[in-house]
Amino acid sequence: MVTSCKLQPRPPSGTKEILVSNHADFDHDHLGHLLMDKRLAVPNFQRPYSWDHNNIEEFWEDLQRARESGSYFMGTIVLANDASNQSRQLVIDGQQRITTAAILFVAIRNRLNDLGKTQAASDVGSKHLADYILVEERSELKLSLGPDDEVAYRKLVEEEDDISIGAIYDSYVQLKEYVDRLAPSKDDYKNLIALTSFLDSGVQVLLAIAPGLSEAYVIFETLNDRGADLTTADLLKNYLFSSAGSDSIDYVQAVWTRVNSRFEKSDDFVKFLRHEYMSRHGRVTSRGLYKALQADIGRSPREVRRYLEGVEDALTRYLAFKEPDSSYWSSIPED
């Protein structure tokens, strides 16, 4: 069961806090129940799944310690209602935790199958991973990931063999090793049932649910403006999305996705943003870039659009300097 409540926030000290208090519903839920109760989707503009071996190890060890005490708080999950699909909600913050939990359920289901507990395995799959749409004769995932992760995750859920190597598969292999050790024989299968129950009712999260993307990013920025370990790209995305307003959010999302997709590494994207800023204003340190961008951009939707128009235009020239054969150069008349 979800325990729903309207939290009474601290007295608002600024516009962001007022918007959070007026437009955010906060619900107490549990990580496993979240996958059971909702249809979730990671937007295409979010970063791909990136948890590595150390993250998974820490997650597993935290779970095992918490099972002894009976409860575990995993922080805040920020969701936004999806204007294009009212049956699902978009994951704005918490993607890594939710995806890892889903992968763990895949590992639990598969281990139960290994041990011959097919009914229990089917129960885990139908509750946490996918629904079967009888009329359409297909399964629908309870969690949809971004384009870089969706294929591998779907193959895991649907038990296909040709899964490409990547972070999703690596995390599955590691978690499967852990659950294999947790239930080494058929006599130990109840350890997996107990773990499933703990994920459903012992791993607590605080849900912040916003009516739309721009409101969700205001919530996310407010929750994370006191020391969270976010990159400059993360902070800038949050700033732009929270400032876009309902009329500009689709444009901001589209441009951000186009520009960000041209860089394989977040550090390279930030380097471009820094060079673009310095081309107009002079030198700025990496540490001071985000605050400088805030002052440069402004807070209105019109200012956000103007900034992104300039960024997209600068990107063409920036990439051309790195690619001598770029078609950009052929468009410049020779003297």
Model-derived features: positions:
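Flexible loop/turn segments at secondary-structure boundaries
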Residues: 84-87, 98-99, 213-216, 227
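Short active-site loop/helix that positions an aromatic residue
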Residues: 98-114
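Short alpha-helix boundary/capping and kink motifs at helix termini
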Residues: 5, 11-92, 96, 102, ...
